[in-house]
Amino acid sequence: MSDEDEPLNFSTSKATEESKEGILGVRSIFNTPLLFPPPMFNAGVISPHIAAALAMSFNQQRMNASVSPPLDHTTISVNSFPSMGSVKTDSPPTASSPTLCCAVCGDVSSGKHYGILACNGCSGFFKRSVRRRLIYRCQAGTGNCVVDKAHRNQCQACRLKKCLNKGMNKDAVQNERQPRNTATIRPALDMDPQNFFREYAGAVSAIMGHSNMMKREDSPSSASDGKTEDEKKDSLQETTMSQLESVLQWAQQFRLFTVLTNSEKRQIILTQWPRLLCISLCEQAEDVSFDDHLTSLMLKFRRLDVSPAEFNCLKAITIFMKRELSLWRAGWDNRASIITVYPAGERGARLVAAALLLAEHSVMGFGNCVIPLALVFSTKSRYVIQRHAINSLPACVPGGTSAHPVLRCSMGSRREKVI
C-alpha cells in the first residue's frame, strides 16, 4: 500500500469488507451521487479518498443550499418565476369538469389559455403582463390578496402571481407581430415638409432609446364583440390603468424629464397626464370598447397613420408644451444649456425640437406634427379623457382605498366639471 493510501488513523484495525466496498463506490463519485454506507464509519479509519469525497459532497450540498433569495411577495413580474420546465404549479381544473371555470378567478372559462383553463379577462391580463414585461406591486403589501371574479382587478400583483402559480406558461405567449399595413419598408425620406415629422420622430426615438412597439388594432372595439358586459368593463379598467402606469414609467425614463427637479416633474405630471394617457390609449389600445367621444378621437389618430416612433415624439413634446420650465440639456456636447419651453403652439413645438435635437441635428419646422398635437391639446380631448378615466377607474377616484396618486391629485378638483 502506498503512502497516499495509508489510513489516517493507525490506532484501529483495517477497514472492514463493507468499508472496502464503500471505497470502491467512491470511484464513481463523478458519475453518480455519493452514498456512504453506515458500516464504513464503524471501522475507525477513513481513507484519503473518502475524505476527499466527503469534502466534495459537503461542498456540493452547500452549493445546492445557496439558492436565490426569497421572492419579494409584494412586487411581482413574470421574471419573478422560473420557466415552466423547472417549476411545480398548482393543478388546474381538468377539462372534464361539468362546469369549466377559470383556474385563476373562478369565472366561466372560455377554454385553455397558456396551459390552463382561464377566462378571457385573466388570459388577456396575463398576455399583456408578459408582452410588456410589467412589474406590479401588491396594493395591500402582503402578496396574499383575494383573487376571484369580484376582486380580480383590485391587485394586479397578486393576480399575476396566481396566474403563474396556477400554471400559466409565460413562454407560450407569442411575440407581437407587426400589422401588415405597416410592415412594408418605407421609401427613403427627403427634406419635404410632409416627411420631416417622420424623420424627426425617428431621431427622437433613437435619442430616447426605448421606442414602444406595441401593436395597434384597426378599430378599438372591433375585437370586443361577443364579450359579456363584465368582461368589457374588466378589460376597460385593465387597459386604462395599464396605459396610465406605462406612460408614467415612460416619462420617468425620458432623459430630458429625469434632469428636472421634483417640483417640476410633479407639475408636469399633474398638468399633462390626461394628454399623455390619451396618446398612450390611441397608440396601444387593444380589444376594448370605449365611449363614442374617445373612440372618435382614436379613429382620427388611426387616419393619421401615426407610427410608434411618432407617438414617442408626441409624448416627448406633450411633456413640455404647457408650462414655462427650465429644461436642462445635461450631458450633451459636454455642457449644459437652459432652453425655455413656451406654452402650446407651433413655436413651442419648434423649441422642443431644438431641445431634443440640438446636439447633432438641425432645427427645422414640424409640418404634420401640428395636426395630432392639436387633437391632443384641445379642451374637449382633455375633458373626454378625464371623464373616461373617472368612469373606468372608480377605485382611483378620491376616497377610494387604492387611489392612484396621480389621479387623486389631478382629478380631485375637476370631477364636478367633467362629469
Curated annotation (Swiss-Prot):
What are the residue ranges of zinc fingers typed NR C4-type? 102-122, 138-158
Q: What is its main location?
A: nucleus
Question: Which is an annotated Pfam family here?
Answer: zf-C4
Residue segments, region Disordered: 211-238
Q: Which GO terms describe its biological process?
A: axon guidance; locomotory behavior; neuron differentiation; neuron fate specification; positive regulation of transcription by RNA polymerase II; regulation of backward locomotion; regulation of forward locomotion; regulation of transcription by RNA polymerase II
The record's CDD domains line, in alphabetical order, gives: NR_DBD_PNR (cd06970)
What does the UniProt record say this protein does?
A: Orphan nuclear receptor that binds DNA containing an extended core motif half-site sequence 5'-ANGTCA-3'. Required for locomotion, neuron axon pathfinding, and regulation of expression of some peptide neurotransmitter precursors and of NMDA glutamate receptor genes. Involved in specifying interneuron identity, in concert with paired-like homeodomain unc-42. Plays a role in recognition of the PVPR and PVQL axons by the AVKR and HSNL growth cones.
Q: Which InterPro entries match?
A: NHR-like_dom_sf, Nuclear_hormone_rcpt_NR2, Znf_hrmn_rcpt, Znf_NHR/GATA
- List each copy of the NR LBD domain by range: 205-419
Q: Which GO terms describe its molecular function?
A: DNA-binding transcription factor activity; DNA-binding transcription factor activity, RNA polymerase II-specific; nuclear receptor activity; RNA polymerase II cis-regulatory region sequence-specific DNA binding; sequence-specific DNA binding; zinc ion binding
Q: Could you tell me which residues form the DNA-binding region?
A: 99-175
Give the CC-aspect GO terms: axon; cytoplasm; nucleus
Could you tell me what this protein is called?
Nuclear hormone receptor family member fax-1
Q: Please provide the record's free-text comment about the domains of this protein.
A: Putative ligand binding domain (NR LBD) may be dispensable for import into nuclei and in the development of neurons that control movement.
Keywords assigned by UniProt, alphabetized: Cell projection, Cytoplasm, DNA-binding, Metal-binding, Nucleus, Receptor, Transcription, Transcription regulation, Zinc, Zinc-finger
Q: Where is the composition biased (Basic and acidic residues)?
A: 226-236
Q: Which domain of life is it from?
A: Eukaryota
User: What lineage, starting at the top, does this entry show?
Assistant: Eukaryota, Metazoa, Ecdysozoa, Nematoda, Chromadorea
Per UniProt, what is the name of the gene that codes for the protein in this document? Answer: fax-1
Q: Which family does it belong to?
A: Belongs to the nuclear hormone receptor family.
Instruction: Give its localization.
Output: Nucleus; Cell projection, Axon; Cytoplasm
